[in-house]
Amino acid sequence: MVQIETERLVLREYTPDDWPAVLAYQSDSRYLRYYPWSERDAEAVREFVAWCVARQAEAPRNVFQLAITLPATGGRLLGSCGVRVNDRARREGNIGYELDPEYWGNGYATEAARAMLRYGFEQLGLHRIWAQCNADNTASAHLLEKLGMRREAHFRECDQFKGRWWDSFIYAMLDHEWRAAPVG
């Protein structure tokens, strides 16, 4: 079982009972803006949480998707953050994160993503970690830059949903960059 504590957060394994908290924030229109679906239902969220729980038992484990909780609020679930090992031979993985819009602007997503970078480089021994974000999501792009990740690609009109084409950015960091200038 993986549990990561930061200055303000606890990133912990999902449990099946987490789905109502996930549904609450994934139903917010601000959250839904950059996702292909226009609404979330209980079944889809239960499937997501069950998928996260099932990854905990895999061997070797390649997906470390953790619930972001805030001890100061009694352990309220604020979002999700994870690192996935994409290619063990090349020691490559990616990170992703999402946060309840009620908690945006407090640095929680940055703190959680930094913890997952640290876990990926220092515990999993990854060489390269990348992240993808919607190019219109300037807050997410800024977060990745604040972590010290470099923009490596701009994919133009690579996704189509909600009646339009969307661009994506790819950011990445290498293990020697992490060691040379640890972010946090």
Feature-to-residue mapping (PLM):
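GNAT-family acyltransferases
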Residues: 1-102, 119, 123, 164-184
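Conserved catalytic-core motifs of GNAT/GCN5-like acyltransferases
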Residues: 14, 85-86, 130-132, 150-166
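Proline- and acidic/polar-enriched loop/turn elements at helix boundaries
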Residues: 38, 65, 115, 132-133, ...
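Positions that flank functional sites
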Residues: 41, 136, 159
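A generic structured-segment signal
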Residues: 80, 94, 109-117, 155, ...
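Conserved acetyl-CoA-binding loop-helix of GNAT-fold acetyltransferases
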Residues: 97, 105-122, 138-146
